[in-house]
A protein has these predicted regions:
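Non-catalytic N-terminal regions of enzymes
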Residues: 1-119
Length: 119
């Protein structure tokens, strides 16, 4: 499947540089549920990795030498790349969390892969 990249999405790709990444991020902080097993977090990450990937989360950008940029479908998703686990050492502070977020968000996403990481 080939699908043109809409102008608004294309704008982000064209304006992005290593000095100025244009992707966005969201932060979610979780607490382990009461009475959850010690394997809860590991099981949660494994469940995310095992979930089926549907459009548009399996699209990656293709920029041909001639022609318009388009979305292509990634057939074999590397879920170890897309779903990861990060944490600050306990008890953890807001400052430590911000340092991790800054490090994770500093670089550009790999354009050879669908443009998302859950970490």
């Amino acid at each position: 499947m080939r699908k043109p990249i809409p102008p608004m999405d294309l704008m982000f790709f064209l304006l992005e540089s290593p000095q100025s990444p244009k992707h966005v991020a969201a932060v979610q902080v979780f607490k382990k549920p009461k009475n959850a097993p010690d394997t809860y977090l590991r099981d949660l990450v494994a469940a995310f990795k095992a979930a089926p990937v549907v459009a548009p989360f399996n699209y990656y950008p293709h920029f041909p030498r001639m022609g318009m940029p388009e979305w292509r479908v990634q057939e074999d998703m590397d879920m170890d790349y897309h779903v990861r686990h990060s944490a600050v050492p306990g008890p953890g502070s807001d400052e430590q969390l911000m340092e991790v977020i800054q490090r994770l968000h500093a670089g550009m996403l790999d354009r050879r892969r669908p443009g998302w990481i859950c970490q």
